[in-house]
Amino acid sequence: MKVRVRFCPSPTGTPHVGLIRTALFNWAYARHTGGDFVFRIEDTDAQRDSEESYLALLDALRWLGMDWDEGPEVGGPYAPYRQSQRRDLYLDVIRRLLAAGEAYEAFSTAEEVEARHLAAGRNPKLGYDNFDRDLTEEQRAAFRAEGRQPVVRLRMPDADMTWVDLVRGETTFPVGSVPDFALTRGSGDPLYTLVNPVDDALMKITHVLRGEDLLPSTPRQLALYAALIRIGVTDMTPQFAHLPSVLGEGNKKLSKRDPQSNLFLHRERGFIPEGLLNYLALLGWSIADDRDIFSVQEMVAAFDVADVNSNPARFDQKKADALNAEHIRRLDEAEFVRRLADYFSTHGYDTGLDDARFAEAAALVQTRIVVLGDAWDLLKFLDESSFALDEKSAGKELKDTAVPVLTAALAALKGVGEWTTAQIEDALKVALIDGLELKPRKAFGPVRVAVTGSSISPPLFESLELLGRDRSLERLRAGRDHAAAAVTMDA
């Protein structure tokens, strides 16, 4: 049987890493098995759903390269793929469930259910008590005459609910632990409890991979599936796999309010898809005990949902950053230049370099950054409007001892014939290391800060070449003046 999995988020808020981890596991399993990845939108909550969030979901999947075989903007044999457009299908299933006696109309109010529990000495918060299961037609007619609007409830079986979870193994909910549950509101509108399994059934989903927070809903869905099979809506029940929770700081579940959970904040910092996907894959799965770094293609080749760990996974930002840095280093030079140029363009960063020079600058920082955003911190000295002396770096390097160093550097660089890295390096080494007999750190620290504004920069001689002769000399003079002024102030 061909594997068919689905990713069916609600379009609310911003995509978060736990949600996208679930999408990744579904997508990888489909690609590993040669199956279908179905993307479905659960937009039945008009008050919370938004078109902006829907578009953000499309953006997230496309940015990460998770293509879908069926769904919005792609179509497929089971269209439409937005629940808001499938209402008639759900109403037809409800009618068939009622006609077959698999479901019934329930008129009890929440207050009446609670009162019955109290009268029987039970906990009033136990939930629905199945009271309306066997109402006569006369009783139902009397409730309607009062103006009551019934909900439709499914008859739960009088037996334990057991299934073999692909991640957690055999799982059982004892008989009586799950009451008859509502499939509709009093208005007749179908609820998530109905539409999600019905869509899975109609779309012939074979495997449901989802977060463990949905584990308690599984007995209800198994019961509904059994009813759908009996009335001829489907001929099978999918296999379930409940993926581990993702924890944040302090081992609390990562919530939508945690900055780490916001997928687009990672993109904003400059994560690349390869790095983020690698890390998300590790939130519940591993390719090997002694290996953390792998490509998406390697993940697809190795991924089996049976290998997913049931223990909670903790989001570790430092580890995510380290993996992203490694994937940046693995990009070939031309691809890194393209990614960095796109990132700079998106964020309004402009080095003022032509394409060839920008490629040279990119090569200087590729192995020195964790996220693409770090590259701007290293290269913004090339943009006159963004250049500024870092106060801490200047305080350390542009002191009285820097005045003779920068004076000697200026004199040496004025005499450089061709403004190239090699000639710049030769001139400065002769003047500062041979001439002033300084150690490299003492010699080049003041020059680096004067020219780039910071003690942390790309390689110095290459930076001077990129900046150009005139601007380099101008900044060295300004740096010397800054150091001299500091001497005066100290005096």
Curated annotation (Swiss-Prot):
Alphabetical list of SUPFAM superfamilies matching this protein: An anticodon-binding domain of class I aminoacyl-tRNA synthetases (SSF48163), Nucleotidylyl transferase (SSF52374)
GO cellular component term of the entry, any: cytosol
Annotated residues for binding of ATP: K256
E.C. numbers: 6.1.1.17
InterPro entries in alphabetical order: aa-tRNA-synth_I_cd-bd (IPR045462), aa-tRNA-synth_I_codon-bd_sub2 (IPR020751), aa_tRNA-synth_I_cd-bd_sf (IPR008925), Glu-tRNA-ligase_bac/mito (IPR004527), Glu-tRNA-synth_I_codon-bd_sub1 (IPR020752), Glu/Gln-tRNA-synth (IPR000924), Glu/Gln-tRNA-synth_Ib_cat-dom (IPR020058), Glu_tRNA_lig_a-bdl (IPR020061)
Oligomeric form and interacting partners: Monomer.
Catalysed transformations (reactions): tRNA(Glu) + L-glutamate + ATP = L-glutamyl-tRNA(Glu) + AMP + diphosphate
Keyword Repeat attributed: no
Main location: cytoplasm
GO biological process: glutamyl-tRNA aminoacylation
Enzyme class: ligase
Family: Belongs to the class-I aminoacyl-tRNA synthetase family. Glutamate--tRNA ligase type 1 subfamily.
Highest taxon of the lineage: Bacteria
HAMAP family documented for this protein: Glu_tRNA_synth_type1
GO molecular function annotation: ATP binding; glutamate-tRNA ligase activity; tRNA binding; zinc ion binding
Localisation: Cytoplasm
Entry keyword set: Aminoacyl-tRNA synthetase, ATP-binding, Cytoplasm, Ligase, Nucleotide-binding, Protein biosynthesis
Record's protein name: Glutamate--tRNA ligase
Record gene name: gltX
